[in-house]
Amino acid sequence: MPHKRRNRVHANQRNFTARRVSVAKLSSAPPNVLVESCNGSHADNSSPDSPKAKEGAMTNGKNPEIKLAVPKCNTTVRKQNEAHIISNIKLDMNLNKDSNFIAPQITKKMNFAPNRVVFGVLVPLNVNDSVLVPHNRKPDALKHTSKESESCKAISEPQLADYAEKVDPMIMAVKEPVLHLDWEPGPFDFFGAYRRTYN
């Protein structure tokens, strides 16, 4: 006769009923919690219905006091009181009248239209360093000066070559090695070398 397998549903029902009975026996009242901070001050966060517990005493034998620590508020840069002091600092706005007048003028200079000349005293300078020597100038033409050339020079745009110092080109001299050939010059047998190669 084959062995009867126990039905899994009946086994689960038996365990579930035992668990339900054990849960029903527990008290539904909230636990008494005593909160202690790290600096020694005590605070009571228990429910308003339950009486306040004394220090080191237990209200019930079943529900002991659970001591929890109070969270501390810290900052990553400095302590909390220093952060409050810095936030309460008020700057002295009674500055000099000259400094109050200079700042709007700087802002006024910076906010200008593209076609408006703000800094008229500056000299325009061509800073194209790819061509240091201007194309329209020749070294021979600089020797012969006249009144017309001087007037054109004053009107023309200054070049970067006028302000840059002349640097001599650097030449890296590599000496060639001295070869010593050690053999006696004589007639060479080309046909004999050809026969030795291909025979």
From Swiss-Prot:
Knockout: what is the outcome? Homozygous flies for rcd4 are lethal at the late pupal and adult stages. The flies that emerged are slow and uncoordinated. Female mutant flies are sterile. Male mutants are fertile.
Keyword annotations of the record: Cytoplasm, Cytoskeleton
> Which InterPro entries does the record associate with it?
PPP1R35_C (IPR029135)
**Which GO terms of the cellular component aspect does the record hold?**
centriole; cytoplasm
Q: Where is the composition biased (Polar residues)?
A: 38-49
Cellular location of this protein? Cytoplasm, Cytoskeleton, Microtubule organizing center, Centrosome, Centriole
Listed GO biological process terms: centriole assembly; centriole replication
Q: Where is the composition biased (Basic residues)?
A: 1-11
Q: Where is this region: Disordered?
A: 1-23, 36-60
Tell me the superkingdom of the source: Eukaryota
Summary of subunit composition and partner proteins: Interacts with Ana3; this complex is recruited to daughter centrioles before their conversion to centrosomes.
What family, per the record? Answer: Belongs to the PPP1R35 family.
Q: Say what the protein does.
A: Participates in the later stages of centriole assembly through the interaction with Ana3 leading to the centriole to centrosome conversion in somatic cells.
Know the name of this protein? Protein PPP1R35 homolog
Native organism is Drosophila melanogaster
Lineage from the top down?
Answer: Eukaryota, Metazoa, Ecdysozoa, Arthropoda, Hexapoda
